[in-house]
From Swiss-Prot:
Residues 11-83 form the Sm domain. One of its GO terms (cellular component) is Lsm1-7-Pat1 complex. Its main location: cytoplasm. Coiled coil: none annotated. GO terms for biological process: deadenylation-dependent decapping of nuclear-transcribed mRNA; maturation of SSU-rRNA; mRNA splicing, via spliceosome; tRNA processing. It comes from the Eukaryota. This is U6 snRNA-associated Sm-like protein LSm6. One of its GO terms (molecular function) is RNA binding. It comes from Vanderwaltozyma polyspora (strain ATCC 22028 / DSM 70294 / BCRC 21397 / CBS 2163 / NBRC 10782 / NRRL Y-8283 / UCD 57-17). The keyword GTP-binding does not apply. Component of the heptameric LSM1-LSM7 complex, which consists of LSM1, LSM2, LSM3, LSM4, LSM5, LSM6 and LSM7. Component of the heptameric LSM2-LSM8 complex, which consists of LSM2, LSM3, LSM4, LSM5, LSM6, LSM7 and LSM8. The LSm subunits form a seven-membered ring structure with a doughnut shape.
Length: 83
């Protein structure tokens, strides 16, 4: 692994560690967006959220439904951002 890749990996790991317990938005490859409190994340990008809302891709502000706890499989996660 090059120095640049190593630096990027440590920054990504640090970012993910710092947002646990905070509100996040998780975009899936299917186009769905989930917004909730990040409870946990693992090395495979599997994500557990609490107090979660699900939104349509075409209108991120349009609430589809509200869920308490949601588990998202890492292979489906496009990105995670702090809300």
């Amino acid at each position: 692994m090059s120095a640049a890749q190593s630096g990027t990996t440590s920054v990504s790991t640090q970012f993910l560690a710092n947002i646990i317990g905070k509100p996040v938005s998780v975009k899936l490859y299917s186009g769905m967006m989930y917004k909730g409190k990040l409870e946990s994340i693992d090395g495979f990008m599997n994500v557990a959220l609490s107090n979660t809302s699900e939104h349509f891709e075409s209108n991120a502000h349009m609430l589809k439904r509200y869920e308490n706890d949601v588990f998202l499989r890492g292979t489906q996660v496009m990105y995670i951002s702090e809300a």
